[in-house]
């Protein structure tokens, strides 16, 4: 199937919006006062984010389903995605995250108005390390703990994501085919070869489905295992876009308990996943490609 880059940008927007609807929607259901699942199991949030990654991947994986600026940058830095489309992808992802968050606010507004905890309200938008107790003396500890947590979780996510989408077709075979085509004068990259295999190879649909299921359960596992300190981050668009929405919406929408958007912490869930992605994709490429 031939897909234009414009369609890919739109798909990244839609996919990221779905991620936020499923993921932050689950957080809102648990954190906001008066909801059906208020103060219930953290597993609800794990399932929300797992499905939030899995469903766009299953629905749009044959077009594009990166839905994460850190992953896009990691792939581009390792030569697995064209730099010419990185900015457009990231813009689409951030806007998609903002749109998805606005839909969550629309649905949950009565419960935002009931909630008296400003951190609970912010937590339905973006992440914050639990070391923070709203005093300046805890900011350094929250920043360090948050950065370590985000880096570790993101590294595992991105290494697993690249592995899941490459190993099924044999990374050595992809490298051999790329080199062969270049030797024949073709201007191709490993990502070009891999994309064509995903579309054309016999049994590709089954392999892609397995990979997408794996990614969903991987995210769910990471949220359950490492979400305790910061909440589910692992994605700059997932944090920055909704945090921006939080800062822009007035108290008439989010309630009188709306507090600070905590921009002092905002660089952590942006930079840590990006650095983790660069390291994870580079390591995978060094070992397997």
UniProtKB/Swiss-Prot annotation:
<keyword id="KW-0813">Transport</keyword>
<keyword id="KW-0472">Membrane</keyword>
<keyword id="KW-1133">Transmembrane helix</keyword>
<dbReference type="InterPro" id="IPR054631">
    <property type="entry name" value="Gla"/>
</dbReference>
<comment type="function">
    <text>Mixed channel protein that transports both water and glycerol.</text>
</comment>
<feature type="transmembrane region" description="Helical">
    <location>
        <begin position="41"/>
        <end position="61"/>
    </location>
</feature>
<feature type="transmembrane region" description="Helical">
    <location>
        <begin position="87"/>
        <end position="107"/>
    </location>
</feature>
<feature type="transmembrane region" description="Helical">
    <location>
        <begin position="151"/>
        <end position="171"/>
    </location>
</feature>
<protein>
    <recommendedName>
        <fullName>Glycerol facilitator-aquaporin gla</fullName>
    </recommendedName>
</protein>
<dbReference type="Pfam" id="PF00230">
    <property type="entry name" value="MIP"/>
</dbReference>
<dbReference type="InterPro" id="IPR050363">
    <property type="entry name" value="MIP/Aquaporin"/>
</dbReference>
<keyword id="KW-0677">Repeat</keyword>
<dbReference type="InterPro" id="IPR000425">
    <property type="entry name" value="MIP"/>
</dbReference>
<feature type="transmembrane region" description="Helical">
    <location>
        <begin position="209"/>
        <end position="229"/>
    </location>
</feature>
<feature type="transmembrane region" description="Helical">
    <location>
        <begin position="10"/>
        <end position="30"/>
    </location>
</feature>
<dbReference type="GO" id="GO:0005886">
    <property type="term" value="C:plasma membrane"/>
</dbReference>
<keyword id="KW-0319">Glycerol metabolism</keyword>
<feature type="transmembrane region" description="Helical">
    <location>
        <begin position="264"/>
        <end position="284"/>
    </location>
</feature>
<dbReference type="GO" id="GO:0006071">
    <property type="term" value="P:glycerol metabolic process"/>
</dbReference>
<keyword id="KW-1003">Cell membrane</keyword>
<feature type="short sequence motif" description="NPA 1">
    <location>
        <begin position="68"/>
        <end position="70"/>
    </location>
</feature>
<dbReference type="GO" id="GO:0015254">
    <property type="term" value="F:glycerol channel activity"/>
</dbReference>
<dbReference type="InterPro" id="IPR023271">
    <property type="entry name" value="Aquaporin-like"/>
</dbReference>
<feature type="short sequence motif" description="NPA 2">
    <location>
        <begin position="235"/>
        <end position="237"/>
    </location>
</feature>
<keyword id="KW-0812">Transmembrane</keyword>
<comment type="similarity">
    <text>Belongs to the MIP/aquaporin (TC 1.A.8) family.</text>
</comment>
<dbReference type="InterPro" id="IPR022357">
    <property type="entry name" value="MIP_CS"/>
</dbReference>
